[in-house]
Each structure stands twice: as structure tokens, then as C-alpha cells.
Amino acid sequence: MLALKLSVYSVVFFFIAVFVFGFLASDPARTPARKDLED
């Protein structure tokens, strides 16, 4: 049961981290000054 809880928490934390990273990187990535970081 502990392994199941840890796996669920890890998946939830992974999706939250991806969502937060995509939300923070979406606006600066569209500006011409930050285009060099996308390569």
C-alpha cells in the first residue's frame, strides 16, 4: 500500500511540475529575446 501511495504521489507531482514549467515557460518563449533558449 505504501508503494502504491508513493507511486501515485510521484505521478501527481510529475504532472504538476510539467504543468507549472509549461505555464512559466509559455510566455517568455514567445518573446523574440528568449528564442535562443529554445534550441
Curated annotation (Swiss-Prot):
SUPFAM superfamilies: Photosystem II reaction center protein I, PsbI. One of its GO terms (biological process) is photosynthesis. The keyword Transmembrane helix applies. Pfam families: PsbI. One of the components of the core complex of photosystem II (PSII), required for its stability and/or assembly. PSII is a light-driven water:plastoquinone oxidoreductase that uses light energy to abstract electrons from H(2)O, generating O(2) and a proton gradient subsequently used for ATP formation. It consists of a core antenna complex that captures photons, and an electron transfer chain that converts photonic excitation into a charge separation. HAMAP family: PSII_PsbI. This is Photosystem II reaction center protein I. It comes from Prochlorococcus marinus (strain MIT 9303).
